[in-house]
Amino acid sequence: MPSFARIDGTNTVTDIFTLDNQDCLDASGNHSSTIGAAICEQKKAGTWIESAEKNKEGLRGNYAGIGHTYMTGVQTLGVASTDIFMPQPPYPSWTGISTISAEWLPPITRPTETDAEVASHKNYNWDESAYQADNAQGWVLTV
């Protein structure tokens, strides 16, 4: 079932509508985002962007959610310029977006656990306070 996100003037998602598949078909029986967006517009005025088509993965990197941001001209998902929906970053310092997947990147690359650390059930977790105190730090090894 296709879903559509309504965005406000700051490109923040404010509403989500899910439509029946047949509601988005053109006269030839092909899926049409334009038709779906027009149906959403009739229900609630605003700018509507398709988030997911039928039962497929999110069309724009992530499924849209309330509070997510719609971004255009982003180099991600293996293409030079695309549009995506992004949740808020998990931490204030995470401002970069992966060029491979539509996800936020930390300012410092996550270290890889050694075999001994894995065997001891240790892993690296982000510590925003540590990063804010010293921008060369951020990943903390925890149990």
What is each PLM-predicted segment?
Residues 1-143:
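Interaction-interface detector
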